[in-house]
UniProtKB/Swiss-Prot annotation:
Localization: Endoplasmic reticulum membrane
One function term, GO molecular function aspect: glucose-6-phosphatase activity
UniProt note on regulation of activity: Inhibited by vanadate.
UniProt catalytic activity: D-glucose 6-phosphate + H2O = D-glucose + phosphate
Organism name: Rattus norvegicus
Keywords: Endoplasmic reticulum, Gluconeogenesis, Hydrolase, Membrane, Transmembrane, Transmembrane helix
Record's protein name: Glucose-6-phosphatase 3
Tissues where this protein is expressed: Expressed in liver and kidney. It is the major glucose-6-phosphatase expressed in the small intestine.
Pathway in which the depicted protein is active: Carbohydrate biosynthesis; gluconeogenesis
Family: Belongs to the glucose-6-phosphatase family.
Transmembrane segment boundaries: 26-46, 57-77, 116-135, 141-162, 168-186, 198-218, 255-273, 284-304, 308-328
Predominant cellular place of this UniProt entry's protein: endoplasmic reticulum
Coiled coil: none
Length: 346
């Protein structure tokens, strides 16, 4: 295993020093694949294009992120930015590598969440686009473009994570494989407009299930805060260690998203617009308004205390699907005052 990790450091060093002109590209790619962006950007963008597809992306995102958290607790996995120092590798072998603000994530490293969660959540989008393209062209070369773009993007995400010292190559590979498999398995099984109790129980299961596993492992003598301690110890700058990269930050986001989706689908606002077909201009207006509300939510910041942050994060992501699914479309439809035919199944 030591040789595998050493090879990962050498690969990161090569990416940083042999291809310096690509630094901004890698930073941009890893930003695009940030799991938080699946919730805040990809979800509304896809939802306003296709309600069914948007809900699929959202559901798969928070289920896969929860599974990624559980996998990391059991698989552990060092991250390169701390392993290179903690193992003594940097003292024995001169190495020219440096960290970035997005390097210092606090959770265990295996498997890569960026690769796993993004790969799974974008799977139904890729399949839908592939089906649309296949229905409009007979060219086999054109038909493979969506799948090729999907694979190319995930490959770039994996390389960016190695470049940033956030993951070793084998962790990236594990994340890619898990993401594709979960996307394939979960896409046909996304629940659509179930009763509110179903979503409430889902949120409760995510929260209590992860908490039970955490305390069970803690009782058995496993210190699951080990990765937080190492990240804080070896990160070049303390301000790069962000609270929203902690494992329980993703748990509060996932459980809040599950509950929020259920509430959104059972609000009076959604009941009024669920069979309304929005025009392209209205969809664009919905997305712009949703992004404006997101900017406001981000402007609010978060409490400095860890426990209060988790509560705030839960409430924030409970509110977010209510805004995207119910309130924003209702506001746009009401203000535009346009009659629309019943929505087609999408």
């Amino acid at each position: 295993m030591e040789s595998t990790l050493s090879a990962g450091i050498m690969m990161a060093e090569a990416l940083q020093n042999q291809l310096p002109g690509l630094e901004n590209m890698w930073l941009w790619v890893t930003f695009l694949a940030d799991p938080k962006n699946l919730f805040q950007f990809y979800f509304p963008a896809v939802y306003y294009a296709s309600r069914r597809l948007g809900i699929s992306l959202f559901w798969i995102a928070f289920i896969t992120e929860w599974l990624n958290l559980v996998f990391k607790w059991f698989l552990f996995g060092d991250r390169p930015f701390w392993w290179v120092h903690e193992s003594g590798y940097s003292a024995q072998t001169p190495v020219q590598i440096h960290q970035f603000p997005s390097s210092c994530e606090t959770g265990p490293g295996s498997p890569s969440g960026h690769c796993m969660i993004t790969g799974a959540a974008l799977w139904p989008v890729m399949i839908a686009i592939s089906s649309q393209v296949a229905s409009q062209t007979r060219s086999p070369w054109v038909r493979v473009i969506p799948g090729l773009a999907y694979c190319t993007f995930l490959l770039a995400v994996g390389l960016s994570r190695v470049f940033l010292l956030a993951h070793f190559p084998h962790q990236v590979l594990a994340g890619l494989l898990a993401g594709v498999i979960l996307g394939w398995l979960l896409s046909p099984r996304v629940p659509m407009e179930r009763e509110l109790s179903f979503y409430g129980l889902t949120a409760l299961t995510l929260m209590l299930g992860a908490s039970l596993m955490y305390w069970t492992l803690f009782t058995l003598g496993l210190d699951l805060s080990w990765s937080i301690n190492l990240a804080s110890k070896w990160c070049d700058r303390p301000e790069w260690v962000l609270v929203d990269s902690r494992p329980f930050a993703s748990l509060s986001r996932d459980s809040g998203s599950a509950l929020g989706l259920g509430i959104a689908l059972h609000t009076p606002c959604y009941a009024q617009i669920r069979r309304v077909h929005l025009g392209n201009g209205q969809k664009i207006a919905c997305f712009v308004l949703a992004m404006g509300l997101l900017v406001f939510l981000e402007w609010l910041g978060h409490p400095p205390q860890i426990s209060l942050f988790y509560i705030f994060n839960f409430l924030k992501f409970t509110l977010w699907p209510c805004l995207v699914v119910a309130l924003v479309p209702w506001m746009v439809h009401t203000l535009s005052a346009q009659e629309a035919p019943p929505i087609r199944s999408s």
